[in-house]
Structures are given as structure tokens and as C-alpha cells.
């Protein structure tokens, strides 16, 4: 398969890149190991700056308009941020990513649901090998996140020091409190509550890699929910590592 650009990763970054390139008349193939829709661990808040950059209206995807955000710090102090226009709008990442993905497919981007196994470069461009296809392109974009397969395949960078987080959902009907968008900083790092139409997205995670700092556990998330929402009914708990060495990488190729 020959194309102008291959994009690895069909999340928002990959979809945005595909949108810009299709508008410029370039042929694009997006590769992702997951098919869509797929679950994505994420609180799901979009800032006004982000929304302004999107090529579509998110009204149909918006779950909640957060005109108030509360920050609670380890010293006990709290800070309220109020914005009548909305500090951020809440979406469900599975729905948002699926919508954006379909948006660029309708624009003419092609999609291959496959796992990338090898990336190489020669005088004519870049060759990408998946578990069932070989693609040749002029340029390659790695848009596959903090735990990037692209970065791993084209560098010697190792993910030695990931930070960890747990995410879950609390149905609004089970919460004894009506809570705004909230960040709570604690000994583990930070926790969050992001309101949606019928549930709260809640989570707890490390802010930075620190060997002396314990990793969050499921019970830490449950304790947070009990304290902030007075509820112990926590559903759809997922844990995920986030690579932290991306800043150490600088591309050595002008094509990738």
C-alpha cells in the first residue's frame, strides 16, 4: 500500500492530523491496533481552547458544561474557578474519539485495524509493517500516545518510570452529593471528579514518577469516592500506566 502519510494512532491527535492533511489534499492511512468505538481511560474534559480547534461542533457529544471548577490542595486550601461560558465541556472519550474517527474517514482517510510491528526508512521514504500489511509512505506521524509504539520502534527509549492511575464511574443517582468538576491533590498525587449527564468520572493517580511515592490502588479510589461523594458504588474500574520519558526523545529523521 502506498500513500502520502501514514498516521499511527486513531485517537484525537491522529484524527486531527488526518483532518488537516485531507484538507490539504494528501492521501492518508491511519493505523490503530484497536477498532472503534473502544474504551479509553480519560476524564473527558475539553477546554474552550481545544474546542475552538476542532473541525466540528461538539454539541451532540457534550455531557455537561462545567462553569465551576474546584481545586483542593494538600494544605487544606481550596480555589474556585467560575466561568459563565464554561471552564470545560465534558464528553465521554469513547464517544468523542469514535465521532472524530468517523469524521476523518468520511473525509477520505483510510483505516487499517492492525498492530505495527516494524518501521524502517530508505531513500524513497518510510516503510511500515503491520501484522498483515506493508505500507510505504513519504512521511510517518506517530500519534499513539504517551506509551507510543512508534517511539519504541524507532528509538532505543525505554519506558522505565511510568506513573499510574485508576479510573471509575459513579452513577449520579448513587451519589449523596451534587459535586462540580473537582481536582483534589493528595499524598499519591491527585484525584478528580468530572460530572457527566448520568454519572461522575472519578480517578486517582500519580502526578510525577517518584520511587518514594506509593502507586495508587483501587481501594484508594474507593476511599476517595466515599469521602467526596458519600458513596461506595464504584463501577467500570480501569487501571493504566502512563509513560513519562517522552520529553527525552527528539526525532532523528525528517520523515518521522
Where are these predicted regions, by residue range?
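Beta1/beta-strand and adjacent pyrophosphate-binding region of the FAD-binding site
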Residues: 1-13
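Conserved N-terminal glycine-rich FAD pyrophosphate-binding loop of Rossmann-like flavoproteins
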Residues: 34-57
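Conserved FAD-binding catalytic core of PHBH/FMO-like flavoproteins
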Residues: 147-222
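FAD/FMN-dependent oxidoreductases across multiple families
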Residues: 118, 210-256
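Hydrophobic anchor at the start of a short beta-strand
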Residues: 5, 26-28, 140
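Conserved N-terminal helical subregion
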Residues: 52, 56-59, 65, 70-153, ...
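Conserved acidic residues
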Residues: 4, 138, 255
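Glycine-rich FAD pyrophosphate-binding loop
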Residues: 19-41
Amino acid at each position: 500500500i502506498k500513500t502520502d502519510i501514514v498516521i499511527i494512532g486513531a485517537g484525537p491527535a491522529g484524527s486531527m492530523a488526518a483532518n488537516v492533511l485531507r484538507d490539504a489534499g494528501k492521501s492518508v492511512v491511519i493505523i490503530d491496533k484497536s477498532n472503534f468505538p473502544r474504551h479509553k481511560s480519560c476524564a473527558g474534559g475539553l477546554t474552550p481552547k481545544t474546542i475552538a480547534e476542532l473541525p466540528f461542533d461538539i454539541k451532540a457529544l457534550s455531557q455537561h458544561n462545567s462553569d465551576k471548577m474546584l481545586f483542593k490542595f494538600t494544605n487544606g486550601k481550596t480555589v474556585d474557578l467560575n466561568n459563565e461560558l464554561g471552564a470545560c465541556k465534558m464528553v465521554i472519550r469513547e464517544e468523542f474519539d469514535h465521532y472524530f474517527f468517523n469524521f476523518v474517514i468520511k473525509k477520505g482517510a483510510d483505516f487499517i485495524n492492525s498492530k505495527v510491528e516494524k518501521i524502517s526508512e530508505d531513500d524513497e521514504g518510510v516503510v511500515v509493517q503491520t501484522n498483515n500489511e506493508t505500507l510505504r509512505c513519504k512521511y510517518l506521524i506517530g500519534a499513539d500516545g504517551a506509551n507510543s509504539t512508534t517511539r519504541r520502534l524507532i528509538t532505543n527509549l525505554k519506558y522505565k518510570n511510568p506513573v499510574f492511575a485508576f479510573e471509575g464511574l459513579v452513577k449520579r443517582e448513587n451519589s449523596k452529593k451534587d459535586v462540580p468538576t473537582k481536582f483534589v491533590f493528595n499524598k499519591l498525587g491527585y484525584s478528580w471528579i468530572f460530572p457527566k449527564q448520568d454519572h461522575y468520572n472519578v480517578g486517582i493517580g500519580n502526578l510525577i514518577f517518584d520511587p518514594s511515592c506509593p502507586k495508587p490502588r483501587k481501594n484508594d479510589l474507593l476511599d476517595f469516592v466515599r469521602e467526596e461523594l458519600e458513596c461506595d458504588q464504584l463501577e467500570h474500574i480501569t487501571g493504566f500506566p502512563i509513560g513519562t520519558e517522552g520529553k527525552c526523545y527528539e526525532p532523528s529523521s525528517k520523515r518521522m
